Amino acid sequence: MNSFEADLKRALFSPLFVFGVIVMLYIVNKMSVNSDLFKICVPVVASLPYSTAWLKDKRSGFIRLYLIRTKEMEYILGKILACAISSGLVISLPIWIYDKYLAEMEQESAYVIFFLVGALWGCVSAVLAVWTNNSCVAYGGAFVICYLLIILCERYLQNLYCIYPYEWMFPQKQWVFEENGRRILLVGFIVVVMCIYYELVRRKIKDA
């Protein structure tokens, strides 16, 4: 089993991933995907599955064992890719379950968009974890950034809707290429954040 497969297995079978799926499914079922509670919980729940994985490896000392068995690049990419996938699924999977099995009428939601939004916030949380060496900042930092972006876009930067978190999931503006335009933007953000994560972890390993 390579580094990525091991990380993905740890992420998807972690208690925090299961907890996140249950929480989001409850919110979607009792309220709706469009509810304010769902919107607020997205960056928080997305941070749960695997954003602090590198911190745990560092504090336990396992990182040295991992780096003996795998290349540095494979180790770092395995961490961030597993984080992105698990964070995306913890948001999109509950919506899919609700649409398929719990909704009064079967419906289709923008699952790819919700997956990408979750992946983005999970990667942001992972960057914060490495940058601050603090799990609490990782779990709460994405929410703070999301909230600041909401305030900025609603009060001061109304025309800059491409950085408005709610607009990614529930568009009110006319997007170039419509949903595909939002997908491209989110993928671009994710790639940038992943690159930042890679460089931060690489430097941390080098300095250790």
Residue ranges and their predicted role:
Residues 6, 60-61, 126:
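Positions in alpha-helical segments
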Residues 20-53, 78-135, 168-185:
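Secretory targeting signals
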Residues 51-85:
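Helix-loop-helix units of permease transmembrane domains in multi-pass membrane transporters
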Residues 1-4, 117, 121, 160:
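Short, membrane-interfacial amphipathic segments enriched in basic
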Residues 28-35, 104-109, 136-208:
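Terminal transmembrane helical anchor/hairpin motif
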